[in-house]
Each structure stands twice: as structure tokens, then as C-alpha cells.
């Protein structure tokens, strides 16, 4: 409809105009991609720019709002219904007649030692939730919840190993709504769980078994298409975040797999960083660099990348979620900054790492900004804080060095990460602008990724995944999971405090100890040099 290829955005079309609403990650990208289309760009978060919800509530009262109820949550639709009449209608399918069919791949069982808990154990916990709430069933609609609960993974969504399905669990029954092609390889296992397989689209009619007086536990992402008919029949819907919160706290088995995967991922990244720093001026472009890194991960035993690799040179790195075109992407030169944000799906684990490296000489501003971002990442990684604090509180550890310099960035500092699931896993997050997120507890895996972006010039981001742990003092803190060198060529030590240098040296000592047994020749030489004390 728009030509915008970002992963998040909303299009509102009225008789008068069309407006694309995006957050700060996509301001520049959306501006470029819809230029000349006549579509108005709404940069949510900027002063004076209403959010999509504000715009609907303030400018469309009394009107009728059509939406695809499968793609909008019940909560969101109910909020809009205070001002407009909401109608569930699919207006896109009649227009998009050559739309590719949804892909269905074979599902597979995740080994119990990787999951750390059996599906039977999780189902017992789920049913205890039903009993406590006096509910007849729990309906899971989030694909990550479904995969986590059943200890299965799939191939239905690019780079996110989930199965397209719904799970409906009652006290004595378990119904899975999924395609036969996906279920076939694990039929025997699903039978062990007592599951009855139904067609994916049959869920809408099947839910008619519930009526007035029944209570269903539902996930916060329940769609309008599923939830509204239940409400109209008098079913009591009670939101439950049990599954999402449970999978945020990784089991010992999951953490073991995650730590092992980060060693393998770090070996790949170190080999790539050595190679790419030698490619300035050779004709290598952003797309070619990304392809090389993706191939290296797959060759090392990764089943898939965890998201489309962000490979950005020079001014393109100022777009936080830049996507290099397959043809005609920028060539890496012997100067300036190159940013690569990438990750993989390893057995039982998902990785996500960003490094910004010097391809040659840097300007004073580029070095200053890189130094600030590294200081920010290390400060959060070394933070100590009491129990009860969430991501809106600890964000200040990362942003303080930047704020002191009069700088900031528009995206969150951290997002939860799944265990061979989605690279973005809620409700854990680090963002001072989002209150009441999941309080930190040991076992949460989250990213630490501050950045700075200067339109038309350069961008910097550094990212490690970290694990929340209890410190010897009894406070909570983080330990790094990501193991890969931070390019010292981007740093100006004169702009670092002694504590910053100690933190960097300590991290690099960990990286060397973790990776050196698995690297040889030029790669080991590079690691030794890259992790020398500053």
C-alpha cells in the first residue's frame, strides 16, 4: 500500500488523505520510501505529532473505522470504540490478488534439556492458573507463547522459529489449531500431550462452545476478531500474562544453551569483524557484507538468522533499522564507520549483537560519539540495583553519559530475547519512556544497545545481550552473554573515565578467555590484539 518496508508502522486511510504512523526507528526510512506518494508521514513521539490512537480519538469521533480484526488487538479496538464505530473488515485481500500464500513448514520438537522444562510440566502450571481463576480454558494466541508452552519450534515465520497456531487448553483437554503439514512430523509427541489437532481457521467457530457465565483466560494480544464475538456472547475474558512472563525467566537448561550459543556466535562475529575491517576500498558493499556474515553463521551450525541483518555504512547507519538493497547498496570505503546488527537461531538460543567498527580514519565527532556509546553500554552492563526495579528505572545507567553530553536516542535501550524464539520478546524491556514493564529478576535475558544517530552523516550502536543475575551484594545486575571484541579503533581513551577503561578491559578479558580456544591463525591474532588492555 505504501512502499514502506519497515517492520512496524500503521496506515490510516480516510476519504481526504492517507497517513503512515511510524516511531523514531523509521523516521528517515519512511520519509525516503514514501516520498512523492502523497502519503502523509506521522512521526510518532515528536512534539505536536499525535499517535495513531490520539489521531483516531481526536479527529474521527462519530465515524466508522474499518480494520482487519485479525491484526488489531481487542484492547486496542475497544479503546478506539469509545470514539468511533469499529467494523471488522478485510479491505486488502480483494486488492492484493497476487498475494503469496502463507508458508507452512514442518514443526519440530525442542529437546527437553534445551527447554529446561517438559511441556507436561508447563501444562500442569497452566491448569493451576485455570483453577485459581475459576476459568474454563486458556486461549494462547501469541505464537511465541504457543511454541514455548509445547516445547516445539517451526518454520512458518521468517527468522522466528514458530508455528502458526492457536492453543486452547481446558482442565482435561488440549486443542491445537494448526495446519496438518506442520503437525505431521510431531504427531506422536502431540498425542503424548493429549492434544487434539484442528484446522487453523476452525478456531473461530470452535470458540462458540463458550457462552454467558464462562470465563476464559486470554493473552493481552488477543485479536479483535477472536475476542469480540466472545464478548458479545457474554463470555468473561480475563487477561493473563502467565505464559509471556514465564518464558521471560529462562530456566537453567535454557541459560546453558544460551551461553553455549553465544560462544559459537562470538567465534563467527570475531572472524567476520577481522575480515570486514580489511575490506574497505575493495568494492565490497553492504549487501555483500551481510550475505557473508549470514553464510558464516549458517556454516557454523545456526539454523537461521534471527532477523534480517542490518549492514550499514556511513550515513546509512543513521537509520537505526536500515535495510541494504540487494542491488546498489553502499560500498565500504577505507574511512568512516560500518555498523552491523545481526543474530542467529541456534539450538535452544537466539542471539543479537551490534558492532560499529572503523573502516579507516575517523573524524573527531565519530570517535567522540562511538566513545560515548561504548561508555553507555558498559555502564548498564556493570549496573547494580535493588529488586523491584524495571527497565524504566535502569535505563538511566545507559543514558546518563549521553545526557551529560546533551545527546539522546529515540529507541529503547533494551528488549527481551527469546530462547530460540523471537529476537524481540516482551514484556521485559529497557526504556525510560515505558512505565510498568516487567521487574527484573534473575534469568531475564535482555539487550543492552545504546546508540547515536546523525542524519546524513553517521550512526553508532553497540549491543550486547546480558543476563540478569543476583550479585554477591544481594543486589541485581547483569553479566554479558555476548562475546565479541569492541573495536578499539573507534575509541578516544582521552574521553573515557578510568572506570570506563576498567570495564572495557574486564569485558575484553572475558571475551578472550571465552573465544581463544576456538580461533586460530589470523583470527586468533586479531582476537589477541582486539582484546588487549586499553
Question: Which role fits each region the language model picked out?
Answer:
Residues 1-534:
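Active-site neighborhoods and metal-handling regions in enzymes and metal-associated proteins
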Amino acid at each position: 500500500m505504501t512502499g514502506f518496508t519497515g517492520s512496524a508502522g500503521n496506515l490510516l486511510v480516510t476519504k481526504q488523505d492517507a497517513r503512515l504512523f511510524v516511531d523514531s526507528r523509521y523516521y528517515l526510512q519512511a520519509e525516503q520510501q514514501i516520498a512523492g506518494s502523497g502519503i502523509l508521514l506521522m512521526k510518532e513521539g515528536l512534539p505536536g505529532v499525535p499517535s495513531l490512537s490520539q489521531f483516531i480519538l481526536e479527529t474521527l469521533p462519530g465515524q466508522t473505522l474499518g480494520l482487519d480484526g485479525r491484526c488489531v488487538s481487542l484492547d486496542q479496538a475497544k479503546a478506539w470504540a469509545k470514539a468511533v464505530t469499529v467494523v471488522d473488515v478485510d479491505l486488502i485481500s480483494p486488492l492484493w490478488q497476487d498475494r503469496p500464500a502463507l508458508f507452512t513448514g514442518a514443526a519440530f520438537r525442542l529437546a527437553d534439556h534445551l527447554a529446561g522444562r517438559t511441556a507436561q510440566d508447563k501444562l500442569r502450571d497452566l491448569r493451576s492458573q485455570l483453577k485459581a481463576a475459576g476459568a474454563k480454558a486458556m486461549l494462547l494466541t501469541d505464537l511465541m507463547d504457543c511454541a514455548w508452552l509445547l516445547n516445539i519450534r517451526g518454520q512458518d515465520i521468517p527468522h522466528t522459529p514458530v508455528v502458526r497456531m492457536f492453543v486452547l487448553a481446558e482442565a482435561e483437554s488440549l486443542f491445537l489449531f494448526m495446519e496438518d503439514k506442520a503437525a505431521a512430523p510431531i504427531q506422536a509427541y502431540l498425542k503424548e500431550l493429549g492434544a487434539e489437532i484442528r484446522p487453523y481457521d476452525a478456531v473461530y467457530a470452535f470458540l462458540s462452545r463458550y457462552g454467558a457465565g464462562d470465563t476464559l483466560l486470554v493473552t493481552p494480544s488477543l485479536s479483535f476478531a477472536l475476542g469480540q464475538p466472545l464478548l458479545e456472547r457474554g463470555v468473561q475474558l480475563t487477561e493473563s500474562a502467565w505464559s509471556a512472563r514465564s518464558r521471560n525467566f529462562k530456566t537453567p537448561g535454557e541459560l546453558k544453551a544460551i551461553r553455549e550459543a553465544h560462544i559459537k556466535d562470538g567465534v563467527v562475529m570475531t572472524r567476520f569483524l577481522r575480515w570486514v575491517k580489511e575490506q574497505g576500498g575493495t568494492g565490497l558493499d553492504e549487501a555483500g557484507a551481510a550475505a557473508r556474515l549470514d553464510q558464516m553463521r549458517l556454516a557454523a551450525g545456526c539454523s537461521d538468522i534471527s532477523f534480517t541483518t542490518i549492514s550499514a555504512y556511513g550515513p546509512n547507519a543513521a537509520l537505526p533499522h536500515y535495510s541494504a538493497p540487494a542491488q546498489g547498496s553502499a560500498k565500504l570505503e577505507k574511512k568512516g564507520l560500518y555498523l552491523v546488527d545481526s543474530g542467529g537461531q541456534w539450538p535452544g538460543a537466539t542471539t543479537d549483537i551490534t558492532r560499529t567498527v572503523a573502516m579507516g580514519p575517523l573524524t573527531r565527532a565519530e570517535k567522540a560519539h562511538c566513545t560515548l556509546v561504548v561508555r553507555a553500554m558498559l555502564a548498564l552492563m556493570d549496573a547494580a540495583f535493588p529488586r523491584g526495579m524495571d527497565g524504566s528505572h535502569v535505563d538511566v545507567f545507559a543514558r546518563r553519559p549521553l545526557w551529560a553530553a546533551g545527546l539522546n536516542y529515540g529507541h529503547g535501550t533494551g528488549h527481551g530475547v527469546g530462547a530460540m524464539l523471537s529476537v524481540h520478546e516482551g514484556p521485559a524491556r529497557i526504556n525510560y519512556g515505558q512505565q510498568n514493564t516487567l521487574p527484573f529478576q534473575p534469568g531475564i535475558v535482555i539487550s543492552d544497545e545504546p546508540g547515536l544517530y546523525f542524519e546524513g552523516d553517521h550512526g553508532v550502536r553497540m549491543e550486547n545481550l546480558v543476563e540478569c543475575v543476583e550479585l554477591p551484594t544481594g543486589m541485581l545486575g547483569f553479566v554479558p552473554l555476548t562475546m565479541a571484541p569492541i573495536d578499539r579503533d573507534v575509541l578516544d581513551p582521552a574521553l573515557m573515565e578510568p572506570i570506563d577503561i576498567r570495564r572495557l578491559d574486564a569485558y575484553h578479558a572475558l571475551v578472550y578467555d571465552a573465544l581463544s580456544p576456538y580461533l586460530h591463525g589470523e583470527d586468533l591474532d586479531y582476537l589477541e590484539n582486539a582484546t588487549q588492555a586499553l
